[in-house]
C-alpha cells in the first residue's frame, strides 16, 4: 500500500490528477436529464466497438479485387471467432446509425441546437455525414456483387454535378471505371481518413459540451 501511495503522490505532484478527477466526477447534472440524453454516449461506445473490431479485421483482410472476397470468407470460416468479430462489427455499425438518428431527434426536439450551442450542432452534423460515409465505404470492402454495384452507383452520383461532376467521379474511383484503385481508396477512407476525422470532431463536440453544459428543458 505504501508503494502504491508513493506512486500516486509522484503523479499527483507533477500532473495534479486529483484535480482532474474531481472536475470529471463533480460535474453538475441537471435534474431534467433522463435516459434519452445517453444516446450520444451510446453512439460513442458503438464507435469504439467499431474501431476495435475493425482493427482486428485488418490483420486478415486483403484490399485487392482478387483477394478481398476470399479474405473475408477466410475470416468468417477459418479464423477463430472471426465470424463473431465481423458480426459484432456489422451489428454495432447498424446500432451506431440508429443511436445517431435518435440522438439527432433528441437534440432537435429539446432545442439543443440553439444559441450558444450552434457549433456543437454543426460538429454533430459533420459527424453524421462521416458516419454515413463509413457505411458507404465499408459496404464495398467485401467486394462481392452487392459491394461492387453499390460502389459503382454511389461513385457515379457526383456525375450529375455541373462542371466538377466528372472530376469528382474520377477522384472517387481513381480512374474512369471501378476497379483496384477504387477499392484502395475506399479502404483508405474507411480505415484511416474517416476514423481520424470522426475522432477529431468527437473531441471538439465533447469539449464544447463540457464547456457549455447540457441544454436546459423546453
Curated annotation (Swiss-Prot):
GO molecular function, one term: metal ion binding
Residues holding heme c: 38
GO BP: any one term: photosynthesis
Subcellular location: Cellular thylakoid membrane
Cofactor note: Binds 2 heme b groups non-covalently with two histidine residues as axial ligands.
UniProt topology in membrane: Multi-pass membrane protein
Cofactor(s) in the UniProt record: heme b; heme c
Sites where the protein binds heme b 2: 89, 190
Binding annotation for heme b 1: 103, 205
Coarse class of the protein's main subcellular location: membrane
Pfam families: Cytochrome_B
Transmembrane segments: 35-55, 93-113, 119-139, 189-209
A single GO cellular-component term on record: plasma membrane-derived thylakoid membrane
Keywords assigned by UniProt, alphabetized: Electron transport, Heme, Iron, Membrane, Metal-binding, Photosynthesis, Thylakoid, Transmembrane, Transmembrane helix, Transport
Further information: Heme 1 (or BH or b566) is high-potential and absorbs at about 566 nm, and heme 2 (or BL or b562) is low-potential and absorbs at about 562 nm.
Family under the similarity heading: Belongs to the cytochrome b family. PetB subfamily.
Subunit structure: The 4 large subunits of the cytochrome b6-f complex are cytochrome b6, subunit IV (17 kDa polypeptide, PetD), cytochrome f and the Rieske protein, while the 4 small subunits are PetG, PetL, PetM and PetN. The complex functions as a dimer.
Function: Component of the cytochrome b6-f complex, which mediates electron transfer between photosystem II (PSII) and photosystem I (PSI), cyclic electron flow around PSI, and state transitions.
Cross-referenced NCBIfam families: PRK03735.1
Protein name in UniProt: Cytochrome b6
Primary gene name: petB
Amino acid at each position: 500500500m505504501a508503494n502504491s501511495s508513493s506512486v500516486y503522490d509522484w503523479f499527483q505532484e507533477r500532473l495534479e490528477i486529483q484535480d482532474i478527477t474531481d472536475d470529471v466526477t463533480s460535474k453538475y447534472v441537471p435534474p431534467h436529464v433522463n435516459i434519452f440524453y445517453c444516446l450520444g454516449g451510446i453512439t460513442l461506445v458503438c464507435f469504439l466497438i467499431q474501431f476495435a473490431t475493425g482493427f482486428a479485421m485488418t490483420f486478415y483482410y486483403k484490399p485487392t479485387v482478387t483477394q478481398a472476397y476470399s479474405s473475408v470468407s477466410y475470416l468468417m470460416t477459418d479464423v477463430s471467432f472471426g465470424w463473431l468479430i465481423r458480426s459484432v462489427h456489422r451489428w454495432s455499425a447498424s446500432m451506431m446509425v440508429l443511436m445517431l438518428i435518435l440522438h439527432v431527434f433528441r437534440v432537435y426536439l429539446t432545442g439543443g441546437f440553439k444559441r450558444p450551442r450552434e457549433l456543437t450542432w454543426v460538429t454533430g452534423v459533420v459527424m453524421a455525414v462521416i458516419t454515413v460515409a463509413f457505411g458507404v465505404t465499408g459496404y464495398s470492402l467485401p467486394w462481392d456483387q452487392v459491394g461492387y454495384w453499390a460502389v459503382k452507383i454511389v461513385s457515379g452520383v457526383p456525375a450529375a454535378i455541373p462542371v466538377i461532376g466528372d472530376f469528382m467521379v474520377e477522384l472517387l474511383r481513381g480512374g474512369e471505371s471501378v476497379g483496384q484503385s477504387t477499392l484502395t481508396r475506399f479502404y483508405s477512407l474507411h480505415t484511416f481518413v474517416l476514423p481520424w476525422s470522426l475522432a477529431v470532431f468527437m473531441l471538439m463536440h465533447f469539449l464544447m459540451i463540457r464547456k457549455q453544459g447540457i441544454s436546459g428543458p423546453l
